[in-house]
């Protein structure tokens, strides 16, 4: 639904000062726009250059003036130009028409695919759902990815931090999650590109088209909407684009009653942009130069990402940690909101184990017996204990070799290597690259499979049979194939 316009809608003001992306606008007495209202400047400057800028009111200064932050470059903007109060917050298009399209912070399509065919819009600023509307019972969000579902399960309507360097498979993991939620949960996804490189956004879009997540022939069959505010854009755009993406996701949850995946890449850039805007507005900086409203800004975004009785928004947020300092106020504030962390390890990617999710570093608040049940909890902890023991033994193996280990330790190493291989699986979105059909593994099958490995029931099977397969039945079939090839 469109934002309700205030009584000041249509009031015209005059630009009195421009300082970079910040502008002061004077309005008639008694006609000041509200904070967070969008102002529209659309006209020609004295040089004849056409200027079209949307700015958001941030402060009321007195003397009939407001201070606003521009959502696009203010190049060419001069004093004396006319500014129109729209009477409402920035609004973006919502609904099925957004699928397969790329938008900027204002909800304008930037993919050269023509206008968006919808009249449905929603304001980017709105309160979080009331407590009475929330689904408070913790429910595991099944992804079909073994390592995540077993060791660091996602919460439906929860928030997950995704950590990983370049080239370890973040994008492929994101694509697989988008694919799986569409197929298994009938849900859609929204991708918010916040302050990252334009090249990365373009690459992601092309990969989405290649893997079928975006259907170029029929956009309505696409599974994702994209909303980008890249690092070359003013801080106002980077600060608000996360809210634009979230607003699109909320429509799918509240109106279509769907389960939605919201990706934010990168949540740190959202905080960084808020810090820049805060300094431009003349606020006193807080610790490490961040804005004094850091906790409020992050909370305003995170509290809207939740499960309601109608549907859910599960958020996966890439987290950049400046200088690897986890105590920095930006990541530290973000961590307080996360339910799970998925850590991608370069060492696993180097071994060819995909997804390269670190089974020992990844965590989840859902992994407790009261939520996932005793069997799941025991299996996950036994898998982690086996892998931890293998990690401890690796130095001994490197120096003395396997033969110097005790019988028990040799058995542990053998099972740990099978577990490590079994934590890999082929992805649907990678079929075109690997030639292997993707696998979605149900949680019960995952637990049963790892229990069999831990119990020693599969000690006789070769290690290679566990690599890049779905469930245990496929392991047995692959082992038979390996045996027959060896004979032949």
From Swiss-Prot:
Membrane topology of the entry: Peripheral membrane protein
Gene3D superfamilies: 2.40.10.170, Bovine Mitochondrial F1-atpase, Atp Synthase Beta Chain, Chain D, domain 3, P-loop containing nucleotide triphosphate hydrolases
Molecular-function GO term, any one: ATP hydrolysis activity
A Pfam family the protein falls into: ATP-synt_VA_C
Enzymatic reactions: ATP + H2O + 4 H(+)(in) = ADP + phosphate + 5 H(+)(out)
Binding-site positions, ATP: 164-171
Enzyme class: translocase
Protein location: Cellular thylakoid membrane
Signal peptide (from-to): none
GO CC annotations on file: plasma membrane-derived thylakoid membrane; proton-transporting ATP synthase complex
Entry-linked HAMAP family: ATP_synth_beta_bact
NCBIfam families to which the protein is assigned, alphabetical: atpD
Oligomer status and interactors: F-type ATPases have 2 components, CF(1) - the catalytic core - and CF(0) - the membrane proton channel. CF(1) has five subunits: alpha(3), beta(3), gamma(1), delta(1), epsilon(1). CF(0) has four main subunits: a(1), b(1), b'(1) and c(9-12).
Similarity-based family: Belongs to the ATPase alpha/beta chains family.
Designated name of the protein: ATP synthase subunit beta
Gene label: atpD
